Design a protein with these regions (language model features):
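ATP-binding/phosphotransfer module of carbohydrate and carboxylate kinases, centering on a glycine-rich
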Residues: 1-76, 81-89, 96-130, 138-151, ...
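Glycine/GP-enriched mid-protein hinge/lid loop-to-helix segment characteristic of carbohydrate kinases
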Residues: 128, 198-326
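Conserved phosphate-binding catalytic cores of ATP/NTP-utilizing and phosphoryl-transfer enzymes
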Residues: 75-102, 207-233
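Glycine-rich beta-strand-to-loop/alpha-helix junction loops that act as flexible
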Residues: 167-173, 237, 362-368
Length: 429
């Protein structure tokens, strides 16, 4: 039995025993905190970690030396002082996460894609496989492609299971039913899908909402660290709009599983359009791709949309996104009116999301801006509606369309690496 008193990890044994906290639990917590600091700040010295965690230097040295021996973190050299003359005393040795300690497989299943790939712990892309899908693609096609791609990625990169942290699955909410995922009180139950995948692999598995995963990827995989960045709002465009807001870089639980609630926000109460739920002028009936196409169909004609009409050879069924973009640039009056109107409504939505969640950044994902000029038009619209402050907070997602599997990677890395203090996960899940 441990004697009462403080241990080197900053805990009191008597308190720990009374409250069911084991030495291993405390060790894991401290390792988690070390990894969290390194993730947030990048290379940091032991003395700075000790100061942040309010632990002794000796305690931090013991913790970090063990993690270095295990290959989880590494020393990367001395701290370079900006001033010419460095202060006297012991030099600061910087440590950082060894982002090649293990590799991660990510799988993201969304309405138009199955994306499978391999990354480092920092989200650097090493390999990928993508399959375009639509509403007719069945479960077997998705499952078979996923299994084949995982095996190919492991084989092509000569990786055994000891090199892999685990597999993260990011599933878009509208894909739940197609993959056999039931939802009760907003909570998805991944048990059936997990059981099917467990028959194919012994690797640790993580399942969650792909919107949440992509939001986390936009925090964790930033190449330039910002120690003051603690919360973002993340808006994903698609047939349904999805939203995640974070606090201290973790998703706020109440938003976690109902990411599509933003669809029901009213942004145009005087609209002629109502959606099936009965709401007038909600996001779903004003801003989604189907809403845009519905508006364009109503005005499609040789008189009102001459360029679009000619490009589509007189049939609206031939209209695609490239034609719409060209029609806008060629000054098809009705097309410009509709798209500019939607730009204003999106600005209203972004203004309201900003003031209701107070994020440091609003990150837009899957919005199809053709170029920087098109994105600037949105920022100008936001400036006009909500002011320069709100406009300055808007940025585009860092996750490329072809790398959507990084959503799954981010989910796995958080759960299996950071939340476990780097402890081996092979005996779990």
């Amino acid at each position: 039995r441990y004697r009462a008193g403080n241990n080197i990890f900053g805990g009191n044994y008597s308190y720990m025993e009374q409250h069911g906290i084991s030495k291993l639990d405390l060790k894991r917590r401290n390792r988690m905190q070390v990894l969290k600091i390194l993730k947030q700040r990048g290379p940091t010295s032991r003395i700075d970690i000790a100061g942040t965690l309010e632990l002794t230097r000796a305690a931090v040295t013991i913790i970090t030396n063990e993690m270095i021996e295990q290959g989880i973190i590494q020393e990367i050299g001395e701290y370079k002082h900006v001033t010419e003359k460095a202060p006297r005393g012991r030099k600061k040795i910087l440590i950082d996460i060894n982002h090649h300690y293990k590799f991660v497989i990510g799988v993201t299943v969304e309405e138009d894609i199955v994306s499978v790939g391999l990354s480092t712990l920092a989200g650097a892309v090493l390999d990928k496989r993508n399959l375009a899908i639509n509403e007719k693609t069945d479960y077997s096609t998705i499952f078979d492609f996923t299994e084949k791609s995982i095996n190919e990625v492991l084989g092509d990169n000569c990786l055994d299971k000891n090199s892999i942290l685990g597999i993260g699955f990011g599933i878009f909410p509208t894909m739940y039913s197609r993959l056999g995922i039931s939802v009760e009180d907003g909570e998805p139950d991944y048990a059936k899908l997990k059981a099917a995948i467990r028959e194919k692999t012994e690797l640790p598995l993580v399942f969650d909402n792909s919107v949440k995963g992509t939001a986390m990827a936009n925090i964790d995989f930033l190449k330039t660290k910002d120690i003051n960045r603690h919360n973002i709002a993340f808006l994903q465009y698609g047939n349904t709009m999805h939203f995640v807001v974070t606090n201290l870089n973790d998703p706020i639980v109440s938003y976690d599983n109902r990411t599509n609630f933003v669809d029901k926000m009213i942004i145009n109460p005087y609209s002629d359009r109502t959606c099936p739920c009965g709401r007038r002028g909600c996001v779903e009936s004003e801003l989604t791709p189907s809403a845009t196409m519905s508006k364009l169909r109503e005005v499609f004609s040789a008189e009102k949309t001459p360029f679009l009409y000619e490009a589509a050879r007189g049939s609206f069924e031939n209209v695609n996104q490239d034609m719409i973009t060209m029609a806008y640039e060629k000054d098809d009056k009705a097309v410009k009116e509709i798209l500019n109107g939607e730009l204003t409504l999106l600005a209203v939505l972004l203004n309201n999301l900003y003031f209701s969640t107070n994020p440091q950044k609003i990150v837009l994902h899957q919005f199809k801006f053709q170029n920087e000029k098109a994105f600037q038009k949105l920022k100008d619209a936001v400036t006009e509606i909500g002011g320069a402050l709100v406009s300055s907070k808007i940025e585009l997602s860092i996750i490329e369309d072809k790398h959507r599997f990084l959503s799954g990677c981010a989910l796995a890395i958080r759960e299996l690496f950071f939340n476990r203090g780097g402890f081996d996960t092979s005996s779990n899940n």
